[in-house]
Amino acid sequence: MKRCLAVLLALALAGCSSSGGPAGKNSTSAPPLVIHAVDAGTFQEDFNPYHLEGVNFGTSGMIYETLMYFNKLKPGEVVPWLALKYEWSDKGKSLTFTLRPGVKWTDGQPFTADDVAFTFRMLKDHAQLNTSALEIKDAQALAPDKVRVDFRTTSYAKLYNIAGGSPIVPKHLWEKQQDPATFTNVKPVGTGPYKLSKFSAQLYEMEKNPSYWQPGKPEVPLLRFPAYTANALQTALQQGEVDWAGAFVPDIQKIFVQGKPEQNKFFFPPEGVVSLLPNLTNPVLARPEVRQAMSLAIDRDKIVRVAERGYTKVAHPTGVPMPGGEAYVPPEYKDAAFKVDVAKAKELLKGVSPAELKFTLLVPSPFTDWVNAAQLIREDLAKVGITVETRGVAFQDWVSKVGKGDYELSIRGAESGPTPYFQMRFMLFGGLAKPVGEAASGNYERWKDAETDRLIEEYAATDDLAEQQKATQGLGRIMVEKLPQLPLFYSPGWAQFRTTKYVGWPSEQDPYAMPSPYTSPDAAVVLLHLKPAVK
């Protein structure tokens, strides 16, 4: 079977259209844009695009680019980026890309198929960088503008991870690194619209790439990223010091909008699901009845109302994003909803010693909504005899501990993809689980289940939509019946932005990209749409 798709969305390229109001014609004197992408008192100097933390939330898309861009707010939309088209062969085990001509790295070297082949071979040889667990067999340049990547298994379903989630790095620089997995890349060279111009622990800046392959883009000449803690950011937003932020704001009308809705805007599209993660290497949390009792005790409606200020909704028990994911939900669970049942929870825990029901709930201190949610969860679980100590830690510490399995309970989000499968795979695929002490790139609860992995493999082995939906429905049943994670609420893509300097921001009417500055590569797509506001 051979399938070819020439991606014909040239008009959807990020630089070719914009929305949001009138704009000026010349950006030579355009002002810098001040951005807050992640809560941090200090920054760590690490621009390896495969290190999923710190400054790389958002900025990797500005420096390093992928072969294609997938708009999660418009399922099915695939936009040519560093590649113009792709072609499957060998029953989904080989994928050939035709690359965009005339692209250069920011050091002036040409971008070629050798760079793409090197990147995928690097992912094959260094499991720590292969965050999507791609089963790469080999990659080779067929011509300066053509590259083929071969896989050990049918990989139709992984196109998003392959083409949209694998930033391409320059071979001529990265091949000199003995261990690219530990390479911090303090002088990044990419193909993207920006390049790093200044870095300190309190502020880093990025300036426009004058040789970027989209002519005349970007129109924002300079990006500034000051370090703000969550509390400091609230003050900065009130005082107009930040132009674009991605944060939970307790009272957004008072703190940010301030009676100027045309100037101070926000857009919170659903981005995935936030769950309570039980570390399943803990023998007590590995017991299904304990997880079921926890789920029955938690008042999710109150969490959404109090901790999330009503900005989102309680998640469906399958974890499937709703509305929009109905076809991927098992028919028998279409109308399922979480209900609090303290009596039943207590009944389920009768065979468990109270001494065993003591856990620490780890949360990132800067995420004030999650901190508040953790307190509510603690109170709810206490009603059924489960003792929980909530512990807030620095963002980087939380990323490290959850990734390495050094926790008992935690709260974490799972990002959505072109279909619910990608979120479910991230949450449940056994191939992403690592031994405690090794950093995982998903499945942080370390769920290992043969049926789960079989369903994930069935989805990946076909390009038949009905079969893919059937496999995802099976994963939904596992979520409802086995509770490997406890879905809480849908994760909004937090985004606050001002139109005083630039217009063209994403909106509900024009959702051309996720609006959050911490989302890669969407943040770069947003910047490529912006135009100076008319004064």
Regions found by a protein language model. Name each.
Residues 34, 87, 98, 131-175:
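Surface-exposed binding/hinge segments that line
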Residues 36-90, 121, 189-190:
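N-terminal lobe/hinge region of extracytoplasmic solute-binding protein
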Residues 72-73, 164-217, 222, 343, ...:
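Gly/Pro-rich hinge or "lid" segments in bacterial periplasmic/extracellular proteins
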Residues 211-255, 387-389:
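Ligand-site clamp/hinge motif
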Residues 256, 281, 285-325, 373, ...:
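Periplasmic-binding protein-like
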Residues 313-351, 367-370:
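Structural transition elements
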Residues 338, 389-397, 427-499, 534-535:
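Extracytoplasmic/peripheral linker and loop segments enriched in polar/acidic and small residues
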Residues 495-535:
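Long beta-strand-rich cores associated with HINT superfamily self-processing modules
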